[in-house]
């Protein structure tokens, strides 16, 4: 007769990574201790989770007598937000596999899946670092065509004609330009549309997921420039509201707040959101508005408000276009279905261009890029706005 030790002879401890990032593979580590005098073969599987895809395979390992073995399981975060591990289903058997015993471990463990900022971190270490360091951020300054005089230097190719200091040029006999310091400690407000239009998926992620990631990416770079960053997320009502604040801790707080923001299957109340901004933003600010206004009803509501808002603030309206639509526009149709798809794509494209032109005529800066490039494009546009003193 083959006898197995009691379930108490097997002890399992789960260890989580420091944090989970959306769509970035992570490893769950398990310390599995065999307290029995026999070699055992064991396996475990986690209870299903909303935010993590753990695959369909069990974690299986061989446990020598009175030993502890570390094993890992791949996890792919598929949704943002808070979640909790609940139970671990464990089995173990003799080395020959003749007898198997099963038991369940209650192991509640809370965790959160954050937006993936790895792209902007890589970008920040290269492009942004170059852009900002060249602009003087080594001395914690952003140089450009701001309003504060800093110095006079030799003219170099690419300098604006209006930056030439003609008096200094006459004195020194060569072209000289005024170097001005771009203003710091300015306000940046992220405005996130969390209504019906942002529930649609582009690839594996929802539009709001892309918007949240891009917003936090912009906030991270703005903190390098010592700008204050706040956020308003809204659907039919205001979901999240944080006044602009400075320091890196504020960016971490924004990440915590936006981690759990979800899109709502309802029409967004744009008038309410813009009214909130008008009553709470008392100084000129950059408003980075993440939305996807493509239907005529939503467009009219937004356009009625944005023109007025743009008279007092710098408004950046950020759309994300779908690669499927772009692909349909680029292909020559060879069937009725493809022709129908092209017709739909042309209609969507025309609506987007109409909305963009109308917004631009109202003084709004419009950014319309593929969702996969949203974070980098938003950061680039922020840097352009700062360097040209548009804020």
What residues fall within each predicted segment?
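Catalytic metal-binding/acid-base residues of hydrolase active sites
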Residues: 294
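An amphipathic, basic-hydrophobic helix/alpha-beta surface used to engage anionic
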Residues: 1-249, 284-289, 297-300, 304-308, ...
